[in-house]
Every structure is written in C-alpha cells, then in structure tokens.
Amino acid sequence: MTTSLAHIAGRTVLGAVLALALLSGVDSGTRATASSVPAPLAHAPKREQQATTIDPQLASRSTARVATDPGPYEYGWPVKPFLAQHPVRGFFGDPRIGNHGRSRQFHFGIDISAPNGTAVYATQTGRIWIHPLHPTTVAVVGRDGTEFSYWHVVPTVRTGDHAVAYETVIGRIEAPYGHVHFAEARNGRYLNPLRRGALGPFVDDTTPWIARLTAESGGRLLLQSSALRSGFDLVAEVDDETPLAIPRPWHDLPVTPALTRWRLVAAHGRVVLGWTTVADFRETIPSASDYDRVWAPGTTQNHVRSPGHFRLVLARGLELRAGEYVVEVAVRDTRGNHAASRFPLAVG
C-alpha cells in the first residue's frame, strides 16, 4: 500500500470519529461514553401488542420469517471460528446516548459478543493504524481504502504493521467489555456488516416487532379519551430479537429493525399518505444531524437490567381532517423477516 500512514490517519473514518469525539469532549477510548462504547440494548420480555393512543383491541399484526442465508459473503467473522455465526448483541443503527444525554448518535457497527481476552483477527489484508490517544481501537485499511475497525481491543500490533486476513491477530478483547465493536467503512461512509453478502454466515429467523403506536404533542402523550385533534406527532416503538443467545448480563436484549416504514389510509381504504421510510439501516446510517429526526424524545439505549426504548418518529405535526384512519407500520430486518401492524386512528 503506497498511501502514507499520516495520509491514512487523516482520511480514515475511524480517525474522523475519534477526532470528533475529542472536539466534542466525548471520550472514545477504553472508558468512553455510550456514544463510542455502546452499551448493548436491553430487552423487556415479549409483550402483547398494544397501543396507548390507538385502541389495542383493534390493532392487527402479521409476520413472516426467513431462516436461510445462502451466501456468498465478502468476509467472515473477526473471531474464531471464522465461518461460524457468533452472537451479536448490538446492531447497526441502534441509538447510542452518552455524556449525560448530550451525545447522541447511531451505532455505526455491530457488537460481537466474545469472552474477554478472545483473539481478534483482521478480516482483510492491509495496513494497521492505531489512534495514539485511543490505543484500544485498531483499524485495518485495505488497498482499495476499505477500512475495518475493531473497538475495545488490546492491540498486539502497531501502527504501520501489515495485517493478513485471518492470520494476523490484531489484539484481544479488553475486559470488561466482553465484545468487539466491529465496523466497516468505504468512501467515508459506514456500512452495515450484516447487509446481505457482507459478513457471513449470518442466519436470522427472528421477527421484528412493533410494540406500540402513540400520538403525542410536545413530547406529551395524548390519551384516547376522545378523538385526537390535528397537529400531533406519531411515534412507533419497535425492536427486534438477536438470532443467537447473548451471554449474561446482556442476555435477552433487543436490537433495532433494519427498516421501518409507514403509511396512512382512510377507514374506507383510500390511501391518504403513501409508504414512507422512517429509518433504513440495511446498508448505511443517516448523518448524525438526522438523529433527532429519526429517534423521538424518550428513546433510550439499553443498559444491564434497564431496557431501552426505540421510539421512531413517523410524523411530526400531522395535520388531518376529522375522520377515521388506519396507520400501517411495517418493519424488516436485513434477512427479510418482517412484520406489519395496523392501528385505528380517530381525528376529531
């Protein structure tokens, strides 16, 4: 690779993220806030379908599951065995909130669970770069500029070393994290490692979930004691399950669906608002400035014994004529498992 390490340091997405963390006062190192050391998302027990502002007795739901993943894959897993699926406790796009709520961002990789001390391998051949102020984050930059970064890893390599895919141990998982945050970036954009054809094998037969739909105003819940007035926000709380069991204490925790869409139809079936994408993490993530557009107030990430709430903004200040409507919400993961729910909505 002919590019100098100084040039790599200036151009890598990892370098940009760490530089931003330094400028914003958020520590991205081994004792960083949740925005850079993401705590996996906690999961409440399976709930019955409910809707706070939409009558739960009238809500309906449909699901479909896909349990195969034929490949091929661009790369295997960064921990042994390379061609066997490992538990993933944090998904791409999950909300990450740190620095006492002042730092909010989308999770830009996946969290692969493994015991502390587990050897982590390079998933591509390339040059090593380690940020001097954050020595437990290792990047491997390939000849084409593709960057794989590994967070919460005690390095066994140095900046400038040459890494060989699935031969070079770049480090070992640092205690007490019990996972490696694994990220992929190309052309300045983070990509979802769980997209089709990327990391494999990855089989997912779990179905995403629409927990509830609420109508709100100024962050306040509007109760269904009477018909809603126009000019309210619609918020959907969604989640998904991890396909493999996660070790304690991060067991049975939710993750974010890869795709969420919605539409509005009149009670007699006329489409009022067509299908609109709220969040699409299947390939990449929105810019950081879109966080508050995507995630509603009250969204929280998971902590041990403290379930997170993933609240997506469907619409803000929705203006509708008086009448009866149906809100349809659909969620999907990267493997095609999907669910849809219909919620009645009365506007006075």
Identify the meaning behind each predicted range.
Residues 337-348:
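Short beta-strand elements
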